[in-house]
Every structure is written in structure tokens, then in C-alpha cells.
Amino acid sequence: MRIILLGAPGAGKGTQSNYISKSLAIPQISTGDMLRAAVKAGTPLGLKAKEVMDGGNLVSDDIIMDIIKERLLEHDCKEGCLFDGFPRTIAQAESLDRQGIDIDHVIEIHVDDREIIDRMSGRRVHPASGRTYHIRFNPPQTAGMDDETGEPLVQRADDTEETVKKRLEIYHDQTAPLIEYYSRRAAGAGTGAFAPRYTRIEGTGSVEEIRDRILEALRG
């Protein structure tokens, strides 16, 4: 089974991706990881990607698609895979279609923007150890202080409310249209003979509750 997991930053995709991968015994396919591996290995595609990146440019969808096709030929992808961070745009989704890479199921983890802002902007971290807290969901024993050392906690720059709002804005502009694209495909309104299933999962509740909703949808 080939799966795409969609959702805004902070919706919990990373946590749920790990659960899905382990539960279904399929690998996570990360385009970023594949690019880095290809560059490190010095493959023809890796060298081509390195040349582009060294010039300060974004790697084209064509190169990414070629790397994905190579990855899907590996033995661990025989029973399927979970796409991590891809596609991000309609153009990339259409590239998958043109290359004949059929997707079986698209899962959207839906969380309201306000909830995501609260989740992410409430994070606090102890820089030295990496211990993380949340002012609402997992507060330290003493506000603003690490439980073990008593040292101050900090808010990472990418967790500020302003930054989170900007990331959500980019998501709604660039990635959210994929939700309409795949929901239309699932309803038979798109082009192409193969139509993936599409399921919207509410991303509120415990991690385990969300996991069970996703697995039930995938096995249904």
C-alpha cells in the first residue's frame, strides 16, 4: 500500500508516520533523506542534484521524481511505502500521476489553525538536554524552569506564534490545495484511471486515539 499523509505543520504527521510505518511494515520515503543519500553516494542523480544545490537553486521535480522511482525499486518498498513530505504541490502530485506511481490511500490529519498555534507556540525546551515541555499540555513543575536542573527553558525561534502563523499561511497557499486535488480524485472527478482512497482524520485527542483512527481507515 502506498500512502500519502497530509496535514499542516504541527498536526502530528511525524508521530503518526512512525506508527503507520511500524504497524504496516512499510518504509517512510523522505525526499530530503533520499537527496542527501544520493549526493553522499555520488550516484548520477546525486551528482546532478548536488550541482543544482551548489548553485543555490532548488532541485527540480524531475530530479526528485527520478530519485523516487529508483527508491521504489528497492526491496523494502515491495509491499508499499509512506511518502513523507511529498508531494507538497499540485505539480508534484501530477508528476506522480504522469510517472504511473499509483497512490492507494491519502490520509489528511485535520487540526484547526488555532489549535496548532497553541500546540506549537506553547512548546518550551531545555537547550542543554533537549528536554521538551508544553506550558499547557506538559508543563514543568516550576514555570519556565527545567525539572531536573532548574535552568531556564527557552522557546525556539520556529515555535513563536508569528513564525507558526507564517508556516500555516505557506501551508494553506501551497500544500492545502492537494487536499482538494486528492479528494476530487477519490470522488472520480479527476483524470486518470486509478483513484486513491481519501480519508480525513480529526487530529485532536490523544496520540493513540489519532493513531487508531488512521489505522482503522487504512485497514477499512
From Swiss-Prot:
Record has Hydrolase as a keyword: no
Organism field: Chlorobium luteolum (strain DSM 273 / BCRC 81028 / 2530)
Alphabetical list of CDD domains matching this protein: ADK
Official protein name in the record: Adenylate kinase
Any Gene Ontology biological process: AMP salvage
Keywords recorded for this protein, A-Z: ATP-binding, Cytoplasm, Kinase, Nucleotide biosynthesis, Nucleotide-binding, Transferase
HAMAP family: Adenylate_kinase_Adk
High-level lineage: Bacteria, Pseudomonadati, Chlorobiota, Chlorobiia, Chlorobiales
Protein's pathway: Purine metabolism; AMP biosynthesis via salvage pathway; AMP from ADP: step 1/1
Domain remarks: Consists of three domains, a large central CORE domain and two small peripheral domains, NMPbind and LID, which undergo movements during catalysis. The LID domain closes over the site of phosphoryl transfer upon ATP binding. Assembling and dissambling the active center during each catalytic cycle provides an effective means to prevent ATP hydrolysis.
Residue span of region LID: 122-159
